[in-house]
Swiss-Prot record:
Family assignment from sequence similarity: Belongs to the conotoxin G superfamily.
Organism: Conasprella delessertii (Sozon's cone)
Primary residence: secreted
Expression sites (tissue/organ): Expressed by the venom duct.
Name recorded for this polypeptide: Conotoxin de13a
GO cellular-component term (any): extracellular region
Recorded domain comment: The cysteine framework is XIII (C-C-C-CC-C-C-C).
Length: 34
């Protein structure tokens, strides 16, 4: 999981962390958003 949540939300509702792009409708190194 990422140490912090970032405002970037992927198509699947995950929150992308700073420096981690959305990949294949998922996020790399991220936590689930609301």
């Amino acid at each position: 999981d990422c140490p912090t949540r970032c405002p970037t939300t992927c198509a699947n509702g995950w929150e992308c962390c700073k420096g981690y792009p959305c990949v294949n409708k998922a996020c790399s190194g991220c936590t689930h958003g609301k």
